[in-house]
């Protein structure tokens, strides 16, 4: 039965470019996925790569102890925060935010990066050099 169904599935030609799988572990600061905001139309998946495991550990600490709170304060609506256990771009962490649209996203990020609490936390010595590369993937609601 599986083989028969598989032939129907692949008969339509190219279905996708590639498949990539990952295993993620939730941060202590947000242990469960949250529902998107009601008017969500844009999702931003962010992958923060670290130069080594210690850099990622320190960035996760920053999120758990300070940054997630500030995200909520300025209205950066999260879906999840996680450490990548298995997958590409290791060592890394992955999180997803959601917005009404690109304008809402840009306004909210601007509020965040100009917030006095962000300026203080991002200048702390323990959080220096925690991210070596940021990958952003934008997804639209269909």
Where are the model-predicted features located?
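Short S/T/G/P-rich N-terminal loop/turn motif that feeds into the first structured element of a domain
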Residues: 1-118, 126-142
